[in-house]
Amino acid sequence: MSLPVSPSIFTVSRLNQTVRQLLEMEMGQIWLSAEISNFSQPSSGHWYFTLKDDRAQVRCAMFRNTNRRTTFRPQNGQQVLVRASITLYEPRGDYQLIAESMQPAGDGLLQQQFDQLKQRLSAEGLFDQQFKQPLPSPAKRVGVITSASGAALHDVLQVLQRRDPSLPIIIYPTSVQGAEAPLQIVRAIETANRRDECDVLIVGRGGGSLEDLWSFNDERVARAIFASRIPIVSAVGHETDVTIADFVADLRAPTPSAAAELVSRNQLELLRQLQSQQQRMEMAMDYYLAQRQQQFTRINHRLQQQHPHLRLARQQTLLFKLQRRLEDGMQNQLRLSSRRSERAQQRLAQMQPQARIHRYQQRVQQQEYRLQQALERQLNAWRQRFGVACSQLEAVSPLATLARGYSVTQTPRGELLKTTKQAQVGELLKTRLQDGWVESEVKTITLAKKPRKKRAAE
């Protein structure tokens, strides 16, 4: 049975052609928000992928000459905004989209803007290490730029109160989220630099989404941080959150609490250091006294082994010098200890640990008194031992024998004259008396008569 030819009867190819023309003329170009899936890039360089939402999907192509202008590479699961034309592929009767442009949507767009700004500022040198300022150690006053009602400020204040309650804090309240937040943060940084009230700044906020933290990815904030004369610690969000402010700041802290730890001193650690220094000082003083005592013992031993008065006098002079140096050294050590104690008291006074200072001061005074008493006892003992040594030397000295009326005579040859056989008439003899020397000439030599021994009775 043959069918009549009528204009209302289409062939398949004509139908597909008509539908394609209708779609292209009626729809034109549209903007589509969707998720990418089934992304592929064959050797031709064209992109083929599917755009979908939770209820439908459509095929899409983006030709090589067009996708070259795209600033990112699409990934499966990424949300995008696509400007495309609707067409129909006539051989299969499938309609599809031909993409003309594509950009990330939502967080994807923000991430693209983040990467572009990061690359540009890095090229300008704003992230270079040579521009990083060192943090003051210790900080004398800390400035905090954050929301006055946020959890970040509460965390910072709590940490500073625990670690260093005497550290002054200046708060520069500002918005940290919203369209006005970047400008307010910039003004707070400029105000802190103009007033010059603190020597380190903490700039940050608590955690949140990428959009919540976006104020700290603003170029104006980055340049204000870079221009700050006061060192800045960035403390934005949690440890996994990274912002442009973190790259520009002089130091990045993973959280606001960690930033407070970095800029503050540990009061307990200072007390431990003071105790350690006191122990080292006491050990040094004990070592110094032991060395001086050993030195005195060696000198005293040498004096006991040497008999002549001249050497004894030299050793006595040296002993006096050493005694003076010992006394001066101890006085210097005591003065140095006193100055260290005064400096420690001043530092502790600023932190108001009055009770511990009073106890340590009493201990230092007790140690000083004990040291002086020990030194005086030791010096008195040394003086007594020295006097005994001098008395012993005087007792065995030849000069003591001469003082009792005896004399010593020498021949011209330097021999001690003991018998008449050593002397000759006309020789000059030299006689040592208590108070000097006498020279005499031998006139005659007379032998002393030996006493006769009585014969034994027969």
UniProtKB/Swiss-Prot annotation:
GO terms for biological process: DNA catabolic process. It is an enzyme of class 3 (hydrolase). It catalyses: Exonucleolytic cleavage in either 5'- to 3'- or 3'- to 5'-direction to yield nucleoside 5'-phosphates. It is found in: Cytoplasm. Coiled coil: none annotated. Its EC number is 3.1.11.6. Its main location: cytoplasm. It holds the Pfam family Exonuc_VII_L. Bidirectionally degrades single-stranded DNA into large acid-insoluble oligonucleotides, which are then degraded further into small acid-soluble oligonucleotides. This is Exodeoxyribonuclease 7 large subunit.
